[in-house]
């Protein structure tokens, strides 16, 4: 059997590698690797999923998803964000990952370029390669709040550029892209006739009233921008595998044809759960309060550990911690921390070559476990 180079060239990601190592060690390991919260989804959402299964709603839906589920997403977008979105502008996918793959596969030809600001979620780069495109990484600096500048993006644009990926709030940094950076990217997209994919899966988790501007909502981006979102983070439903794209109808229609040949449709019980999640009876505010409390524990704890620094956490449930003062690279730090103190974090190198002096901490465990992890982290850096 001969396997393809396009797949053999995809190395296992560092987040998954550390996650797997933590599971293999087991015992009292505190796993802060994946963005997979331990808080349960709202009770009515769980009940809706169970009711769908009991009613044997376990077959196929339309390729783009149930009309009622797409309309539930559209209605939420209209009510929450004032967006002019109809069900026909929405396709439900197998998680946000499904949206990323299907969008890029629909938008780029082999040899086209995709601009990916870093630090980046690892899937953007790998999926671009899988589609035959060339990812062009633009590395943001910590002193700029991890927001790329207009000059950086402009310098990365070539005649082969087709797509710019925007991820705000950002994974892994937990930072929100500054408004001037958002407007600069929009201006460049218009000038060079580029499409922008806006990954907004953490939008519901912005803290302290920090201003948030979606590039999708700028009038000049109408028809040249899409949104990726999911129930995963907003409602703590990572295992339900239900994401979606909002975008121009030609893109949604193309993705629907692609989905027929890739996944058929998103899982039907999860679609019914999403209808409940976006319904008027759902209160997910407890999730926000829990993550906000954990964020404070992490921010206060990191700033009290010698050798570590943290610029800030605007949103999501990640802290991108600078470890430069320890003199260690990110992989040595992460592997050493796991071996010696049984705490699993992700090396910053996973999110771009420029970030080997960072680690990512996911505060997806209880406050008690976070405090224990911070104590072990202090012991590791001060030994």
Each language-model region and where it sits:
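Extracytoplasmic catalytic/substrate-binding loops of multi-pass membrane glycan-assembly enzymes
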Residues: 11-13
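Short beta-strand to alpha-helix junction loop
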Residues: 64-65
């Amino acid at each position: 059997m001969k396997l393809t180079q396009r797949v053999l060239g995809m190395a296992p990601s560092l987040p998954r590698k550390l996650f797997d190592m933590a599971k293999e060690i087991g015992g009292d390991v505190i796993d802060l690797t994946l963005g997979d919260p331990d808080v349960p989804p709202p009770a009515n959402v769980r009940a809706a999923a169970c009711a769908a299964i009991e009613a044997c709603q376990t077959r196929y839906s339309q390729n783009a998803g149930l009309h009622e589920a797409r309309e539930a997403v559209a209605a939420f977008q209209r009510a929450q964000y004032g967006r002019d979105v109809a069900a026909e502008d929405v396709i439900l996918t197998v998680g946000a990952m499904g949206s990323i793959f299907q969008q890029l596969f629909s938008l780029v030809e082999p040899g086209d370029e995709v601009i990916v600001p870093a630090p980046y979620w690892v899937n953007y780069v790998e999926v671009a390669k899988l589609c035959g495109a060339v990812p062009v990484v633009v590395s943001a600096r910590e002193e700029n709040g991890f927001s790329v500048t207009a000059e950086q993006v402009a310098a990365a644009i070539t005649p082969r550029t087709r797509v710019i990926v925007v991820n705000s709030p950002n994974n892994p940094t937990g930072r929100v892209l500054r408004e001037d950076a958002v407007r600069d990217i929009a201006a460049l997209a218009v000038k060079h006739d580029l499409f922008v994919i806006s990954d907004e899966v953490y939008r519901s988790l912005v803290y302290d009233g920090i201003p948030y501007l979606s590039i999708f909502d700028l009038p000049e981006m109408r028809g040249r921008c899409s949104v990726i979102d999911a129930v995963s983070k907003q409602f703590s439903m990572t295992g339900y595998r239900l994401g979606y794209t909002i975008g121009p109808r030609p893109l949604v229609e193309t993705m629907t044809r692609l989905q027929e040949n890739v996944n058929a449709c998103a899982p039907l019980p999860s679609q019914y759960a999403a209808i409940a999640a976006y319904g008027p009876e759902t209160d997910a505010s407890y999730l926000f309060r829990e993550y906000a409390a954990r964020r404070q524990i992490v921010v206060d704890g990191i700033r009290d550990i010698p050798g570590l620094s943290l610029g800030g956490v605007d949103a999501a449930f990640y802290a991108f911690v600078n470890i430069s003062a320890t003199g260690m690279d990110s992989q040595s730090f992460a592997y050493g921390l796991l071996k010696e103190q049984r705490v699993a974090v992700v090396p910053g190198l996973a999110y771009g070559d420029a970030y080997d002096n960072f680690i990512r901490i996911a505060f997806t465990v209880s406050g008690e476990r976070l405090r224990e992890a911070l104590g072990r982290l202090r012991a590791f850096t001060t030994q």
